[in-house]
Every structure is written in structure tokens, then in C-alpha cells.
């Protein structure tokens, strides 16, 4: 991707210059972003527009600019990014540029460089010899790192709604609501997930991360998440001590929080089942050891072990135990989450506000993000904290997951029938 700015001055609206410029850019396979637009108030007042022209590479952009010059476009000089060295470890220069989660480019030595490892609330560090830049968190800053300060030479490209709509993420571009048609939405999510899984199987790239809360187990939908993992629709699992603990409790005792998952009734002594489950895993050594010893024979964590799916169980101050697999150092947990999120195509957040917001803070805005919760305020909080690309589905996760599995099974059966007809 390559970009250049153009400027238009004069009666660019009355003379239809502005729409002609937009049409020409799109007709030549480029894209654009309006950076500034000032409309003249009176008939004699000129208008002004600054537009970012985006193309596949430098040659493509030059071809577009050559055509736009004929329409009156001016090519201004672009300011270079400003850099200052970090004075010591974990200390940023005054006035450092604080990143968003949107795709970002910097102008350095006459070239636009795409910033790597994009996330919100970080700083941009530039490596002149390698002609590259990346986002680093404040705790990873080292003395001497060249940090971007101010806004000069920085371009942010927010995700935009495609001009040709129709997909899931256009259909759902509105506030979270319990009144949206659940079956239609779940069907579209299943189609997206199926396509992502097929791409992952063919290329090893992309994939889906599930962020799960204990409500998955409490509502009796643990089997559905386990099946998603077994079917290949989960490439990483993020959760806390609670989901894993209650998943193991449900396997060993048939309860979650002491409530029988078949009858919905509390069982005698059930209040201690989660502690006994933790104790069993402690005795075994780890969740993996419990699977290998035949103690755990099914469930979400069992499927993660059997299918080599990496998971991050991030600790909390309120945890019982916790399980030996839980990462109690939040910095280490966050680093592992960030590593597993790299290159993923979708994140499915299921009934966990804490872990959903934590994951959202690590995500670039172009990753498809779906948040399922019975409380609409959870989606609102997620978006308020910067994850504006999140699409909210207000429903019980215990209903959502089984329906999702059902839709995915239908898609797989349709594929099998199609392949047999071709034979």
C-alpha cells in the first residue's frame, strides 16, 4: 500500500471537480480518504480539499496522480515524522504520539512506512536502518529507542464501510440490540467462520480466537464450545481461571457452581465442587497432565489439549486456587495474548466483559470482532474503550453457541453434498 496527498482549490463543487476526482481514483483501482474539507460560504468563495490517495504501490499511485493533475490537483510537500530518543527504559519522550488501533503509516525519509504490531495506547518506534516502524507498549521501551513525537508525518486509516455492502459486518453496523434477528446473524457469523477456517486449513494463516467467560459452562453450552474446538474453528482460547475451573468441575461432577447442569438444581455439597476440581488438577500437576492421566476425558480444556490449541488463562485477584495453568503475572499474560492474536482474522468474545475489553485493547481495528453477551452494556463498554469495530449480539451465550454449532454443521454437510455431486 502506498499513499500521497493531493490538494484541490477553487470552485471544486460547482464545477464537479471533486466528484470527478473521486470517480477517477476509484476507476483506476485506488482508494481515498478526505483529510480536510472547507466549503466556501458565498458563491465567490473558493473551496478547499485535502485528499489522501491510496494505491497498491508507488507506481500505481503515480499513475493516478498523473490523471488527477489534469483535473487540477496539486501535490503538496509532505512533512516528515519527528523522532526523539527515549531517555531511559520505560520512559517516553514528552509529546510522544499515542497510537490508535487503526492502520497507521509514517512518513520517513521520503517514504510511507506501515507501522507493525498495531494496537491502541502504544508508542511508535522507528528503526532507520531497517526502514520499519512498530508499536511498542511503554513497558517495552528501551533507552535510545527512536520514538515518534507529535502528529507530523503520521497518517491513520480507519476501517471504512465497503461501498458494496451485503456482508455480515455491514448488516450489523449499528448499536447492540436484543431485537436483531438472531438466526440470521448467527447464520452469517457461521459463514464467516467457515471461510476463515478453510483459509486457515489451506494456508496456515488467519484463524479465530475465542475469548470465553464461565457463563459458557454455567448455561450448559460447554459442550458446544468443545465441539467448535474439535471441528477446527478455534485457533486460540483466552479465558480466566473460572472458565477452566467450571469446565473441569462440569466434567468431574456434572455441575457448575454446584448446580446440576442437567436438572438445574443445586446438589448437596456442590458449593465445594469447583475447589475439589482445582485440587484434582493440582494433584495431577496441570490440565495437560490430567488429560494424559485419563482424569479429564472431555470438555473445553480437554479439547484444547487434544487438538494442540494454545490457551491463555489470565489470573484475577478474586481467583480460587488458581489452577496451575493460570498465568498470575498480568504482564506475561498480556504478552502471550498479544502474540497469539497476531495475524488472526476474527475474535469471538463470549460473555466476559473483563477479558473482552483486555483483548480488545490488543487488537487492530481491522480484525473482525464479535461480542456476545446478555447484557447490552458490555458491548457499549467495549466500544467506549476503543474497540469500535466490535459487533454486538445481545443474547444468552447458552443459546448462541449451540445455534452456531448447528449452522456450522449445516455448512459442512452442504459442502460434502457439493463435493459428492462434483464426483
Curated annotation (Swiss-Prot):
Keywords: Lyase, NAD, Nucleotide-binding
Catalytic activities: L-ornithine = L-proline + NH4(+)
Keyword field contains Iron: no
InterPro entries: ArgZ/ArgE-like (IPR005239), ArgZ/ArgE-like_C_1st (IPR048964), ArgZ/ArgE-like_C_2nd (IPR048963), DHS-like_NAD/FAD-binding_dom (IPR029035), LOR/SDH_bifunc_enz_cons_dom (IPR007545)
Top-level taxon in the UniProt lineage: Archaea
Similarity comment text for this entry: Belongs to the AgrE/ArgZ ornithine cyclodeaminase family.
Protein known as: Ornithine cyclodeaminase
